[in-house]
Regions:
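P-loop/Walker-type NTP enzyme "switch/lid" segment
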Residues: 2-12, 19-92, 166-171
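Inter-motif core of Ras-like GTPase G domains
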Residues: 85-108, 114-115
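Short, aromatic/basic amphipathic alpha-helical patches
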Residues: 46-51, 141-151
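Conserved C-terminal guanine-recognition region of P-loop GTPase G domains, centered on the G4
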Residues: 111-133
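Short, well-ordered beta-strand core segments
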Residues: 78, 100-101, 127
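Short, conserved loop/helix-junction motifs that constitute active-site signature segments
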Residues: 95-96, 119-125, 148-149
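Beta-strand-loop-alpha "switch" segments that mediate conformational coupling across diverse proteins
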Residues: 135-137, 145-174, 187-192
C-alpha cells in the first residue's frame, strides 16, 4: 500500500508531512514502513540520515522508473514524498497510489495549486487536504476550511504552526505533531478499505 504526499507547489510541508506520517505508521505497528523519497533534492532522505526514525527505511526514487519500481516492489506501507512541479512524475505516482495526502497552507495561491494536484488523482483514489503550519484562530485558516468544504474536498488534518514541527531534522519529532499526523494517516488508510 502506498500513501502519496503530493502537491505541485513547493514549500507546503510535503517532506515534513511524509516524515511524520512514516513515524506515525511505525507507531501504529506497520512493518515494514518505507519512506520513498521521489524528490531529487532528497530532503526526506537527508532528514532520516540526520535523525533516523526506528522502523522507517528510506528509499530514494528520483526518477519515474525508480519510483514505479519502489512503489510496486514492497509488501508494507510506503509513504511517498513527491517533488514539486514534476507533473509527469506526479501523474505516474498518483495513478499507483492507494491514497493521496495533499499538504497545503491556508490562503494565497495555494488553492489553485491544490486544484491542479487534485485533477491528477484518479476518481477512485481517496484524497484529503492537510493544512500545514496553520495559524489557529485566523481568518486565513477559517476561509481555507470553508473553501475546501465548499469544494467537497475532505480536510484530513489541520497541523498548527509550531516551532517543534518547523525545526525539521534539527529536532526530534514533536510528540503533538505525531498525534496529529496519526489522525491524518488513519483518515488516509480508512479511505483505502
Amino acid at each position: 500500500m502506498n500513501v502519496l504526499v503530493s502537491n505541485v507547489k513547493g514549500g507546503v510541508g510535503k517532506t515534513t508531512s511524509s516524515v511524520y506520517l512514516a513515524a506515525a505508521a511505525v507507531a501504529r505497528g506497520y512493518d515494514p514502513v518505507l519512506l520513498i523519497d521521489a524528490d531529487r533534492q532528497a530532503s526526506s532522505a537527508e532528514w532520516l540520515e540526520e535523525r533516523p526514525v526506528e522502523g522507517v527505511t528510506i528509499v530514494e526514487a528520483p526518477s519515474e522508473r525508480t519510483l514505479t519500481r519502489a512503489m510496486s516492489g514492497h509488501d508494507g506501507l510506503g509513504i511517498v514524498d513527491t517533488p514539486p512541479g514534476d507533473e509527469r512524475l506526479l501523474q505516474s505516482a498518483t495513478s499507483a497510489a492507494d491514497a493521496v495526502v495533499i499538504p497545503t497552507r491556508a490562503g494565497g495561491v495555494e488553492f489553485s495549486r491544490v486544484l491542479v494536484t487534485l485533477e491528477m488523482i484518479p476518481a477512485r483514489t481517496p484524497r484529503g487536504v492537510v493544512i500545514c503550519a496553520a495559524r489557529l484562530g485566523t481568518n486565513d485558516l477559517a476561509e481555507a476550511i470553508a473553501w475546501w468544504t465548499a469544494q467537497k474536498v475532505p480536510i484530513w488534518g489541520v497541523i498548527p504552526e509550531r516551532v517543534g514541527i518547523a525545526a525539521g531534522p534539527e529536532a526530534r519529532l514533536y510528540r503533538e505533531g505525531l498525534a496529529e499526523y496519526d489522525a491524518v494517516l488513519r483518515r488516509a488508510l480508512r479511505g483505502t478499505r
